[in-house]
Amino acid sequence: VRLVGSEMCIRDSAYPALDDKALQARLTSELDQVERLMQGIRLLGLCPDNVQARILSRGENLSIAFMHELLRVRGLELDLIVPEQLLVTDGGYLEAHVDIEASRVRFAAKGLRSDCLYLMPGFTGGSDKGETVLLGRNGSDYSAAVLAACVDAECCEIWTDVEGCYNCDPRLVPDAYLLKTLSYKEAMELSYFGAKVLHPKTCLLYTSDAADEGLG
């Protein structure tokens, strides 16, 4: 990605069919929304929680725009899941919790095709008014687990910048070692005691049957 004045140019020899103009239009639309919201904040001198949620959620939408175009040029059939429409939540704008059963109903009504690859921005859901809400710390991992639960997925894979779960914090303990397997109960205990690789509310989504299988 290269910025030239106010224009954004996207080039990659590995993706010659990539539609620069369409992608640029999507990115510009997202950034324009942020700019309008920021102008409102400057005028009012404050930032309500619902506005903060909309601004902080834009990063996921920008990532989805890139991913959608990169997968499209590879010839994949794609569809977008809008979390504000399908993930039913309760709580505030910045730390909402997903109602799994209510969300399952909406996913069932939408109907997912087996021949289609679905993309969904993480970290967000919808209020009872359809407004954007955030799922809090580790919200992207949480929304991945929520999505897996709502569609009865056989597996939920979370790719991150760390190798996995260690027996203790490798930043503090030099000889910390990677755990090859970990039960969901153990993962939940680690998260409650401060391990940042997993969040308690993500672990809570797994059933007791799944907990016996563990992570590995």
Please state what every model-predicted region is.
Residues 1, 5-203:
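Nucleotide/pyrophosphate-binding catalytic subdomain
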Residues 3, 209-216:
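A short, hydrophobic C-terminal helix/tail in secreted or cell-surface proteins
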